[in-house]
Amino acid sequence: MKKYTKDEILNRVKSLPSFKRIPGDYWLVGIRSKEDLYNKFDDRFYLLKNEELILSTTGTTNSGSTGLMEFYTYNSEGCAVVKADEWYYSLWTPGLHKGKMRALRQNTPVKFFRDNNKNQKAEEIGNVRQGMIGINFHAASYQVDDRTIELIGGWSTGCQVCNNIKEYYKIIDTIGKQGDVSYCLLKEW
């Protein structure tokens, strides 16, 4: 996936119908790859403070094999796919993911689809839904180390997940105890 410049990102997020303002504090942008490689981390996250780009890293905005192929074990309607090209103001607040990992936990409703066709692609299909469904921002490991995880597996069934553990903790440490964190999810353009 292409790495985007600060200006490219800002121009794109400001063009969305859901745009209200650029947050004055830290916020995140996720960019969903056109490739959507099955069970692979092929997306990017960008941390910004107001209009300043702080850092970027790799991850996924899509579910892995567990979510796409075994969704019936936790939700018979399908795997959650967060709606892209949307702003989610104050989406997250610092907390713990599953009580085990420092993370950003869902704080406000998110728009999403339920993908249940088992075709190994995370797709925005069916009706748009909205709700509190536990869409967190977290790492792909409970271990704090410098690994880069290759396969998504069960680490995402809708969550936004970083696979570079060291860079993930840079994001979490930088955000610190900020009250809430906004998110803008984009499709690669």
Regions found by a protein language model. Name each.
Residues 1-153, 167, 172, 188:
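Cell wall/extracellular polymer interaction/catalysis modules
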Residues 172-189:
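Internal interaction segment
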